Structure formats: structure tokens, C-alpha cells
Amino acid sequence: MLSPERLALPDYEYLAQRHVLTYMEDAVCQLLENREDISQYGIARFFTEYFNSVCQGTHILFREFSFVQATPHNRVSFLRAFWRCFRTVGKNGDLLTMKEYHCLLQLLCPDFPLELTQKAARIVLMDDAMDCLMSFSDFLFAFQIQFYYSEFLDSVAAIYEDLLSGKNPNTVIVPTSSSGQHRQRPALGGAGTLEGVEASLFYQCLENLCDRHKYSCPPPALVKEALSNVQRLTFYGFLMALSKHRGINQALGALPDKGDLMHDPAMDEELERLLAQVPGLVNSVTASPEASCLPSRTPPRVGSPWRPLHHSRKVDGESDGSTEETDESET
């Protein structure tokens, strides 16, 4: 049965809203690239499997970054996959560096850009050194905000800079995606940024931005709520407020509340089933509990008739061996 939302929209608007054309183009490209493998299973089965994987959120695994970030659904799916794959890090209380979290991201998306990981880490670390250790939950919620709302935050950074320089907020020019790449995020070390900007004025600018920024923008009412208890704020203080706001996390819908972050019985059962299918892996994990904290640099691959559709590559990264730590942030 069709949902009321579907019936209220013309066909072309609904297809555009759900990015159906993006998935059709991707499916056809994969069909053509792997037609010899797919011919033995049938085209109808291929499309069934492909769109089932889209619905389940597994279609983004081991894909190129341009596809992972192509639609809101892809971004939510990637966030959920990262959480479910590596929540053991948080469950065991391990603290990792930015470079180590980036290695984990590259296990799911080999060409994941380092810049995005650095920006997410900066939200947690603020003015601390970038080689400090972070808890899994702190990094995950900061990464969620940075990754899902990336374009919106680039525009917010430009607005913040303009307010710091004393420009009239009514004449703020929001950069395009191309021009925004050349503007640097505000540095917390500057004399002006320590005092921040007036929260009410900042929100007025963000409200206007949200009206125009339909693709990737947190609900304005929740943004206002996040700023309601402060008179002035810094740019990274604003990002930290977004990352800790329960309502924004629930509106995005990718991750559970912080208190439930380490609980996923269905995934635990599925992981046990998959691990049992990999010869030698269960014994090695049992013999060395610490080994389960982080994935191997060369994880075993489980064969699948559809696996050629995902272009996985080996990635490697090394920790800088830092021993500094950051405490778990309070909710």
C-alpha cells in the first residue's frame, strides 16, 4: 500500500526526492561492468538484490566516496554501518587517534577523505593536539554531524567568519560548493574566535540559510533549541552542541541514543554467525581477546555472487603512537 506521502507528490518529485535515478544509474553501470558474472544469475535477480541492498543499507560497503556521499540515504547507511562494524571499540573502552579512526573509515570506504576525519576530530578535540585519543562515542557523534551535514557546515563556517569580521548578517553571502572549498574553517586559536559571536544573531543567519539549504540541514527548531542556553558561542562550540543534541540525532535517524550505542543484539547474533563461517578466525579471536578491538589490516573476504559489484581495495594506516587521552564527553 502506498504511503500518504507518496500519494501527495507527483511521480517526478517523488523519484527526485528519493534519488531513484541515482540508484538506477548505479545499478545499470554495475550491471554492464559485471554482465558476465551476472548473466548466470539473471538480470531480474540482480536488480532485486541491488535494491534490497539499498533498502538494507549495505549497498555503500566498499564503494567509492563519491557514491557513499551521493544521497542522504547513503550517508545514513554509511554512518550506521560504521557504528555497527566498529562499536566493539567503544564497548571495550578503547581510545583511538584521529588517524586510527580514519583507518577504520577506509576499511568501509577505501578513498574516504582524510579532511573529513580531521574536521570531525577537531569537534571533539577543540584546541587539543590532533594526535590526542578519543572515545568511540565522542568521535562517532561528531563524525555524524560533520559527514551528514558537510555542505551545510561549510556555509555555516563562512557565516561565522563574516560575523566575526563585523559584517551585517543581512548581507551575508553564502558560498557555493566550489567557492566554499577555498575558505578555511575558523581557527579557535585566534583572539576574535575565543569570544565567539552573539548566539541570537548567529541563529538568525542560520535560519535564513536553512530556508535555502534543503539537502543537508538540521531542523531549524532543534538548532534554535541547541543555542537557547548560551549568549555567545564559538564555531566549534556550535558543532559540539549539535553533536550532543539528542533531538538532532533522533531526527537524523542513523544512530541510537548515546545510552544505547553499545547495544545491538541482532548485530551481535549476525556477527557470530558470519564469524563461524570464516575458517580459523574464531579461534584466533578467542585466543586473543584484544584482537577483536580493531579489525585486521587485511580482513578476510567472504565470497558472494554479488561481491564483484563492490570495488574493495586494501588500505593501510599507522597510528602515531600518541599516549594522550581525552575523557568521555558527558551527554
Curated annotation (Swiss-Prot):
Record's protein name: Centriolar satellite-associated tubulin polyglutamylase complex regulator 1
Stated family: Belongs to the CSTPP1 family.
Subcellular location: Cytoplasm, Cytoskeleton, Microtubule organizing center, Centrosome, Centriolar satellite; Cytoplasm, Cytoskeleton
Gene Ontology cellular-component terms listed: centriolar satellite; cytoplasm; microtubule
CDD domains in the cross-refs: DD_C11orf49 (cd22959)
Residue span of region Required for interaction with TPGS1, LRRC49, and TTLL1: 1-225
Gene Ontology molecular function: protein-macromolecule adaptor activity
Species classification: Eukaryota, Metazoa, Chordata, Craniata, Vertebrata
Biological processes, Gene Ontology terms: regulation of protein complex stability
Subunit structure, interactors included: Interacts with PCM1. Interacts with TTLL1, TPGS1, TPGS2 and LRRC49; the interactions link CSTPP1 to the complex TPGC. Binds to alpha-tubulin.
Region of interest called Required for interaction with TPGS2, as start-end residue ranges on this chain: 112-331
Organism (species): Homo sapiens (Human)
Job description of the protein: Regulator of the tubulin polyglutamylase complex (TPGC) that controls cytoskeletal organization, nuclear shape, and cilium disassembly by balancing microtubule and actin assembly. Regulates the assembly and stability of the TPGC and thereby modulates polyglutamylation of the microtubule, which antagonizes MAP4 binding.
